[in-house]
Amino acid sequence: MAIELKMPALSPTMEEGTLTRWLVKEGDSIKAGEILAEIETDKAIMEFEAVDEGVITKILIPEGSENVKVGTAIAYLGTDANDVTLDGASAETKAEESAPVASPAKTEAAAVEEAATPSLGKVINSAPEIPEGTEFFQQTLREALRDAMAEEMRRDDRVFVMGEEVAEYQGAYKVTQGLLQEFGARRVVDTPISEYGFSGIGVGAAMEGLRPVIEFMTMNFSMQAIDHIINSAAKTHYMSGGQVRCPIVFRGPNGAAPRVGAQHTQNFGPWYAAVPGLVVLAPYDAIDAKGLLKAAIRSDDPVVFLECELLYGKTFDVPKMDDFVLPIGKARIIREGKDVTIVSYSIGVSFALTAAEALAKEGIDAEVIDLRTLRPLDKETILQSLAKTNRIVTVEDGWPVCSISSEIAAIAMEEGFDNLDAPVLRVTNADTPTPYAENLEKKGLVNPEAIIEAVRKVCYRK
């Protein structure tokens, strides 16, 4: 039986691309991981890999084809050169031509959306900072971030946004959509591709009393600006004896994303959280994103604001409040439970909630904590939950060594040891650079199944 090879999504915002050229022809035998074609978008040319071995039995889209929609079948992969009969799933998809077809990347994003919306009644959709009776409306995380910046720019004319493609292109992930039209080019500033340059300008502007919001196309590129972030922004208040503040926000997507390789999938939360003088925020949902970004812009300290591109398009309930600002340094219990505490942040919260729902069917009642702030860490909420459940499992979309998970384990041991009935277990990504090949990438990233396994161990169910 043949399977369809579909036009991949190279980013969560990609809708179509150009199939630049085929690197294989009909009848070629291929192995998993072999490069089949080159796909071009308005930003880059990427390679399309085979996810399985077989024979290219038919090429459906010729090379050079433009505006190929994501999810379009571009070739058949079969067991031999004459195999063009689709398997059941592919045949059904083909028969239902009007139904949208998900690419591998969009399938993962859809899984994240499902994970982030568990059906258990114990999930707390609100936050303790929201008054009872508040009306809610639905908004994507991307829109919540945009509204937070727009509201603060209306409130304070010292606030401005600067970064690559934030103005005319409206952000690499469309987070700054509409800001240029409302506030103009003096306050929404496109920059050259020089993170070191525009971050330094931002730090200087902050020291002179402005409130810059610096967008990195990805936090991986913040490595080019790390001297300004750590040696200038983070240390100025201390080294000036409290005379000079640096109210600046460095924000952008952080952590793993589908098929972007080892250099674009790193989690910098633990890196920046290790630095005295920095505030580090990592929102999970639109409530976190809006309330914390507004707080970050108002903060007199430098803030590193870590977003997740897989959650940008996810829709959440957001409170209808004139000025919704969350406190920095305060975690929230997003699901109540009594048997085990699962602590996470950013996209890890979605996996934790999915795991908690599955564990409930086994009779394990898990409490889930959304950290929201990585520095300063809310030790009080963690330790209070530990005192109730006597077990902690941490979940982190990042490496295990010198991680936020490691810090939580240390806190539990140093300040909550008498309440521990089991060792603290960490569920993280593999301790290796993230592979580009889809099958290897999947094995190396944190997932709900690994969380379930860890919880069973600390509850002595296995």
Swiss-Prot record:
Coiled coil start-end: none
Role, per record: The pyruvate dehydrogenase complex catalyzes the overall conversion of pyruvate to acetyl-CoA and CO(2). It contains multiple copies of three enzymatic components: pyruvate dehydrogenase (E1), dihydrolipoamide acetyltransferase (E2) and lipoamide dehydrogenase (E3).
InterPro entries: 2-oxoA_DH_lipoyl-BS, Biotin_lipoyl, PDHB_mito-type, Single_hybrid_motif, THDP-binding, Transketo_C/PFOR_II, Transketolase-like_Pyr-bd, Transketolase_C
GO BP: pyruvate decarboxylation to acetyl-CoA
Name of protein: Pyruvate dehydrogenase E1 component subunit beta
UniProt subunit comment: Heterodimer of an alpha and a beta chain.
GO molecular function annotations of the record: pyruvate dehydrogenase (acetyl-transferring) activity
Top-rank taxon, per record: Bacteria
SUPFAM superfamilies: Single hybrid motif (SSF51230), Thiamin diphosphate-binding fold (THDP-binding) (SSF52518), TK C-terminal domain-like (SSF52922)
Domain Lipoyl-binding: from-to ranges: 2-78
N6-lipoyllysine sites (modified residues): K43
This enzyme's EC code(s): 1.2.4.1
Pfam families: Biotin_lipoyl, Transket_pyr, Transketolase_C
Cofactor binding notes: Binds 1 lipoyl cofactor covalently. Binds 1 thiamine pyrophosphate per subunit.
Cofactor(s) essential for the protein: (R)-lipoate; thiamine diphosphate
Organism per entry: Zymomonas mobilis subsp. mobilis (strain ATCC 31821 / ZM4 / CP4)
Keywords (A to Z) from UniProt: Lipoyl, Oxidoreductase, Pyruvate, Thiamine pyrophosphate
Reaction(s) catalysed (UniProt annotation): N(6)-[(R)-lipoyl]-L-lysyl-[protein] + pyruvate + H(+) = N(6)-[(R)-S(8)-acetyldihydrolipoyl]-L-lysyl-[protein] + CO2
Positions annotated to bind thiamine diphosphate: E195
